[in-house]
């Protein structure tokens, strides 16, 4: 009897030790698994009844139809920048039925994020923006697959980051506030033939009725759009990029905020400083930009009838201006090789980006021509000026043939303005 009791005690002890060791082993494995998965940022879609999905999105189904909603569900959209504009884009795409998105942003929520971010709260301060969005959106749309990447997008890591899982995005949304990275991303999407839309500047804007979406070539009255457009033209991209922008000009009654001239100057400085955070902005405007982008994507991919982007195509106009320059070069007996340095692309750039489509002398925008500016300098972007044909004739005779000084022909104001444009071009070059 006693012997059996000891056997029972020994067996119980062995089982207890084995169970303890097993529990420790399982716990250790669990901790290792947690550590390994700590940095994984993919939210897998949970099972969600299709009837509930349809009920939740009943109004979208009524508006866009069965086929339109099917197309939206099939999209894989990459949003680069999860801050003041990007957070609204992500939220409304997921709320509207998109089932797969990737969010890319290296930054954390800060206290000033609460002014413009779509869903961040005080307790989110210090948390990665992508994690904040993923947690919030997973509660709204448990069917969604959200890939959150707390990394900076760069030219060097672009392919590995966007195509990390071997999947090709159907759309890229640019919400970056670093202008160099913004231009790099737009160039990347354009060259890889991925549909893209970009958010331009919300700074100094306050009129929601002036916000519109169009091709980059059609933007106006927005210094940030102009900076981006000009940099893209330098890379051979004049059209084919959709952007949301505001054509609102700063009200002169608010010159205490920023004068129109200073606005352009500060925008160019923002390019040099790489970020757009140096300009004053109204907290509601980023949301309007983000909602506009989300709406545009939803209607575009679903096939809902919408107005197509206009594209500025003035090749015939540029060709006629180029002809005036080539004829001048022939009259001056300039080396043909030198005069051929300017083609239609360069002429378009000079006309639209450097001189804003008008003569710096008279301000006229009709009967335009190009002329060599200084007789003793080589042909280059900083020695060619846009002016009217009549002004070209006078300039050619007095400056290029008779050898008069520029100061004898033009006012100090005109010369300073042209010199400023040339210095600006030197920066972009």
Swiss-Prot record:
The modification Phosphoserine is found at residue 259. It is an enzyme of class 6 (ligase). It comes from the Eukaryota. GO terms for biological process: cyclic threonylcarbamoyladenosine biosynthetic process. InterPro entries: ThiF/MoeB/HesA, ThiF_NAD_FAD-bd, Ubiquitin-activating_enz. Its main location: mitochondrion. Keywords: ATP-binding, Ligase, Membrane, Mitochondrion, Mitochondrion outer membrane, Nucleotide-binding, Phosphoprotein, Transmembrane, Transmembrane helix. It is found in: Mitochondrion outer membrane. The chain crosses the membrane at residues 3-23, 74-94, 279-299. GO terms for cellular component: mitochondrial outer membrane; mitochondrion. PANTHER family: TRNA THREONYLCARBAMOYLADENOSINE DEHYDRATASE, TRNA THREONYLCARBAMOYLADENOSINE DEHYDRATASE 1-RELATED. Catalyzes the ATP-dependent dehydration of threonylcarbamoyladenosine at position 37 (t(6)A37) to form cyclic t(6)A37 (ct(6)A37) in tRNAs that read codons beginning with adenine. Belongs to the HesA/MoeB/ThiF family. Present with 8430 molecules/cell in log phase SD medium. ct(6)A is involved in promoting decoding efficiency. It is an unstable modification that can be easily hydrolyzed and converted to t(6)A during nucleoside preparation by conventional methods. This is tRNA threonylcarbamoyladenosine dehydratase 1.
């Amino acid at each position: 009897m006693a012997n059996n009791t000891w056997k029972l005690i020994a067996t119980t002890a062995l089982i207890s030790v084995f169970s303890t060791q097993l529990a420790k082993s399982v716990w250790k494995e669990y901790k290792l698994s947690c550590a390994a998965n700590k940095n994984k940022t993919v939210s897998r879609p949970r099972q969600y009844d299709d009837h509930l999905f349809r009920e939740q999105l009943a109004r979208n189904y009524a508006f866009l139809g069965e086929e339109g909603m099917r197309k939206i569900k099939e999209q894989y959209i990459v949003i680069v920048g999860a801050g003041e504009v990007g957070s609204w884009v992500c939220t409304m795409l997921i709320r509207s039925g998109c089932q797969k998105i990737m969010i890319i942003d290296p930054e954390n929520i800060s206290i000033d994020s609460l002014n413009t971010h779509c869903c961040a709260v005080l307790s989110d301060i210090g948390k990665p923006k992508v994690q904040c969005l993923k947690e919030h959106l997973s509660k709204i749309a448990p069917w969604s697959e959200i890939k959150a990447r707390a990394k900076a997008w760069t030219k060097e890591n672009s392919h590995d980051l966007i195509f990390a899982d071997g999947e090709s995005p159907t759309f890229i949304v640019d919400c970056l506030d670093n202008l160099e990275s913004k231009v790099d991303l737009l160039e990347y999407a354009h060259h890889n033939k991925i549909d893209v839309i970009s958010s331009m500047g919300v700074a100094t804007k306050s009129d929601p009725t002036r916000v519109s979406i169009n091709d980059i070539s059609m933007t106006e009255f927005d210094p940030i759009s102009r900076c981006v457009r000009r940099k893209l033209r330098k890379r051979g991209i004049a059209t084919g990029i959709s952007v949301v922008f505001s054509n609102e000009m700063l009200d002169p009654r608010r010159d205490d905020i920023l004068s129109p001239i200073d606005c352009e100057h500060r925008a160019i400085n923002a390019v040099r400083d790489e970020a757009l955070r140096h300009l004053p902005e109204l907290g509601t405007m980023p949301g309007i930009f983000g909602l506009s982008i989300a709406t545009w994507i939803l209607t575009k991919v679903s096939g809902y009838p919408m107005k197509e982007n206009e594209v500025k195509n003035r090749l015939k106009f540029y060709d006629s201006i180029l002809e005036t320059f080539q004829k001048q070069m022939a009259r001056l007996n300039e080396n043909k090789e030198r005069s051929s340095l300017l083609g239609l692309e360069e002429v378009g750039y000079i006309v639209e980006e450097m001189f804003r489509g008008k003569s710096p002398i008279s301000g006229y925008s009709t009967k335009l021509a190009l002329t060599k500016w200084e007789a003793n300098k080589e042909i280059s972007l900083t020695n060619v000026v846009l002016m009217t044909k009549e002004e070209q004739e006078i300039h050619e005779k007095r400056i290029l043939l008779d050898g008069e000084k520029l100061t004898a022909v033009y006012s100090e104001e005109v010369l300073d303005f042209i010199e400023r444009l040339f210095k600006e071009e030197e920066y972009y070059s």
